[in-house]
A protein has these predicted regions:
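Catalytic cores of DNA base-excision repair glycosylases
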Residues: 2-212
Length: 212
């Protein structure tokens, strides 16, 4: 498949800005990343990273999570917001991982999205970061920035954006690209008052070109 030269330049520039292109959530076990991503909904990764050390110490195994009282789990994740729903999802997810998948995090979209609290965004992240598969993680940063850049058509629908990114971004670049979108969205292309004049991508940005 042929890709737009401007998109490839954006990918390379982002590599220069953020060489690692890694998820900022901290974890040691595969299921810990799955749970951390669930906690990150409507919450910052920085806040999740403050919460998970104590959470994963209190519940050090899937079995411990599966046997946990959601109310106690909720006490550990209270500051992440929406803790009642999230705590129930973590416990139910742990139970299903043990009952249906022998304690292993699934390696395919269908099984992942069948788990409590796991949507396409979370599943894509797991497929990319855990299994090294092509993954198009369409969070708010990615949706906003790719629309501004002109890589996508500006749709706010995560599924539509994912479909467009699959055609626009080489599979091998997909996971790191989406992680870099998050970092770039925090540093430069913010939701409000983006730093367009100082943006290193403005030469290839659809909105940036309008500023000239």
């Amino acid at each position: 498949m042929r890709y737009k030269a401007s998109t490839l330049r954006i990918i390379e520039k982002l590599k220069e800005l953020y060489p690692e292109g890694l998820c900022s959530l901290q974890y040691e076990k595969d299921y810990e990343l799955l749970f951390a991503v669930r906690l990150s909904a409507q919450c910052t990764d920085a806040r999740v990273n403050l919460v998970t050390p104590a959470l994963f110490t209190r519940f050090p195994t899937l079995e411990a999570f599966a046997a946990a009282d959601p109310r106690e789990v909720g006490e550990y994740i209270h500051s992440c917001g929406f803790y009642n729903g999230k705590s129930k999802d973590l416990v139910a997810c742990a139970q299903q991982l043990l009952e249906r998948f022998d304690g292993k995090v699934p390696d395919n979209m269908e099984d992942l999205t069948s788990l409590p609290g796991v949507g396409r965004k979370t599943a894509n992240l797991i497929l990319g970061d855990v299994y090294g598969q092509p993954s198009y993680v369409c969070d708010t940063h990615c949706i906003r920035i790719t629309g501004r850049l002109g890589i996508t058509d500006g749709s706010k629908d995560p599924v539509k954006v994912e479909q467009q990114l699959r055609k626009a971004i080489p599979p091998a670049e997909s996971g790191p690209f989406c992680h870099r979108m998050v970092l770039f969205g925090r540093d430069v292309c913010t939701a409000r008052s983006p730093k367009c004049e100082d943006c290193p991508l403005k030469v290839d940005c659809a909105q940036g070109k309008k500023l000239k």
